[in-house]
């Protein structure tokens, strides 16, 4: 008699111990074959961290000797993230809540910045550092980025949901306005050099322009200086610097009272988006379908751009290199996607935003 054991921890695994060779098939809930293998003794698995109601079939010749479909209803599902960035932390909870409702399961979530969501998603159990969870039925550690896919597509792919933009709900702290004058929040730093706006004097020109329009400018970057070895990136002068690794409750407070946000593709841009603030996103490394939708995205499409999508299609270069540039590394065109975004391009989007806001009664009421 063959021994067949199932596990859905990390990914579906079928452990076989049989005298005869058996055929193991793993299908998704739609019946699509995900993997199959003939085996006497060992493990058949599908090392893809996605959640499905997996179907496991085992055949002895033509005869089906085992059939099991995972049903997630009332199951304990543990979703854990490791080394997750702020933007990803903000992106996922709304989709996880939709997954919980679709499959009627008990979801436990381990992620950074859980203090942003605990009250807004009371039916998800957020685990703290050191918390232990026993008797887990299903567990995954999702990939943050699915090769070639926009960021907003990753949660639906992993969680088997319809694709679409879901804006999360945030727990808001007690709010207090700290700047009486109208102001704009900016964030100039990012996790890699190639994500910066590298136009010479670009940020200085933006700050000067905003001040001419009557706005104060508040920089909410985590650091004054980002050290990339060969290059140090400084926050611009001429603005109010509320930098430093402050609690996110302070960043939420700053963003709540601002008129709009200007930044690169960073976690603070995602935080502003989650708070329904208009976002001017300056980005050459990504296309408009990669992050959240904003009518105020600034990209120069007359030069090489959107390389974040190239990087998963066999292009050269190491994404761990902060100076990564898959098309033009080591040439005069390196990072032209960022350098060739001019102040005038950014100014045009700022002007469009201000004009739009002045004609939007709902947005005015939200301030």
Task: Give the residues covered by each predicted segment.
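Catalytic machinery of carbohydrate-active enzymes
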Residues: 1-367
